[in-house]
């Protein structure tokens, strides 16, 4: 015969688990006077998967307004994109800067 080991103190209460979405960050390219426009378009297409038209539109916004948002991502993805773009720019000897800003 099996013993009934139900102890009222060992009952696990079901609680409501609330998941909150992670904070989002804008990834922003900053204009400079030296990076060629076609390089900016290349960065937008390669790292942010934009088509030619969208990349050109964002590049012109960066050029005329001084900065442009490339996308909005959770913090770890935004940080990775910023690092990748900044390293790629440096490797290609361009001063193009990419930063992230909390939304």
UniProtKB/Swiss-Prot annotation:
Description of how the protein assembles with itself and partners: Binds to the N-terminal domain of the chaperone ClpA.
Record lineage: Bacteria, Pseudomonadati, Pseudomonadota, Betaproteobacteria, Nitrosomonadales
SUPFAM superfamilies: ClpS-like (SSF54736)
Species of provenance: Nitrosomonas eutropha (strain DSM 101675 / C91 / Nm57)
Protein name (Swiss-Prot/TrEMBL): ATP-dependent Clp protease adapter protein ClpS
One of the protein's GO biological processes: proteolysis
Gene that specifies this protein: clpS
Coiled coil: none
Alphabetical list of NCBIfam families matching this protein: PRK00033.1-5
Similarity remark: Belongs to the ClpS family.
InterPro entries: ClpS, ClpS_core, Ribosomal_bL12_C/ClpS-like
Disulfide bond sites: none
Protein function: Involved in the modulation of the specificity of the ClpAP-mediated ATP-dependent protein degradation.
HAMAP family linked to this entry: ClpS (MF_00302)
């Amino acid at each position: 015969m099996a013993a009934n080991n139900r102890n009222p103190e060992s009952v696990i209460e079901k609680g409501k688990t609330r998941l909150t979405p992670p904070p989002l960050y804008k990834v922003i390219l900053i204009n400079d006077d030296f990076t060629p426009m076609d390089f900016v378009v290349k960065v937008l297409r390669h790292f942010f998967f934009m088509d030619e038209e969208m990349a050109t539109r964002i590049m012109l916004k960066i050029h005329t307004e001084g900065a442009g948002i490339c996308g909005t991502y959770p913090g770890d993805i935004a940080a990775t994109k910023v690092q990748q773009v900044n390293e790629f720019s440096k490797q290609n000897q361009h001063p193009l800067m990419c930063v992230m800003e909390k939304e």
